[in-house]
Amino acid sequence: MANKMTMKIARLNITLILTLVGVGVWAQGPNNSGTYYQNANGKKGEALKTAMYNIIKNPDVVSYSGLIDAYQKTDTRPDGYVRDWYSNVTNFRHNTDKAGNYKKEGDVYNREHSIPQSWFSKASPMKSDIVHVVPTDGYVNNRRSDYPFGEVGKVEYQSTGGYSKLGPCRTSGYSGKVFEPNDEIKGDMARIYFYMATCYEDKIAGWSGEIITGTKYQPYSTWQFDMLMRWSEQDPVDSVEIARNNAVYEVQGNRNPFVDYPGLENYVWGTKKVNAFSYNNYDVDTNGIDDMQQEMTPAPDIITTLYGVRVNSHHLSPGIYIRNGKKYLVR
């Protein structure tokens, strides 16, 4: 009897060990992130932000000159040209059309600091952190200067087709000049700003700039922060942004959690900050995106990927698509 009991206990122990090992092996975060975010599990609000900081801090950034080569991984359109964040009429060739002399939109592309480098005194690693240093048309970038992002009232300058704009801010709380990126990248920029507030939690309070408040937890002016939260909701994470985030991980070894976990900003600063974060069982926030069926026969409209490639609508894989100019989610 004793031997049987011992064997039974042993089997139970082995089963328990295998169960625990199985949990450890199979618990995975989104976008092939594995257990990258595991140390943030169970955290809330400010503690969650600090946990994310400890995970993504100290990126192994490339040199400033090395960004040009790195853009071939992070910012290449399906047709092989550079993805330009400020203009949609350019066809820049990687390396060939890089920063140089320019007189007009479409001449060259260069490296744009979404958070102007003058705000952090051109210090490293922020200066070449590819999460926020993106390729843009050189002329349009120059017009942006170091103005904060915002929503323009009276337009003083706009790129071709009004893709990007510059002028006095129309948002309550600020009347200075702002640069307004296109609607299709406003969410991307918002999530970059959330990343910068998190990855550089130990530094950002010491930065200058009209929207920097000198605080660690939520470092942006109220009007700016509220706008960024709205931008992130109105322009949700898409497959282009996810692909870029994965490429960034290959380049500098860290990720943007606000891309991997859509709506994470609400868990850090917003209405869900009292809720515990779960890295492998996350309640994805798809506010702003309507659902669409996988099967659509016959197809009533032209449906494309976020890159503009038309797809067969008879069986859509899970993801985000564009239908009649609006984003839809297939679960």
What are these regions (language model features)?
Residues 2-14:
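Bacterial N-terminal signal peptides that target proteins for export
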Residues 9-10, 320-331:
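C-terminal tail/sorting-segment detector
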Residues 22-24:
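N-terminal signal peptide c-region/cleavage motif recognized by signal peptidases
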Residues 26-92, 267-275:
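N-terminal module-boundary/linker segments of secreted carbohydrate-active enzymes
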Residues 88-108:
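Short, His- and charge-rich active-site/binding loops that engage polyanionic ligands
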Residues 101-110, 114-285:
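Domain-level detector of nuclease and nuclease-like folds
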Residues 277-309:
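Residue-level detector of functionally pivotal "anchor" positions at catalytic/ligand-binding pockets or at interdomain
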Residues 311-313:
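C-terminal trimerization/auto-chaperone modules of long, extracellular attachment fibers and adhesins
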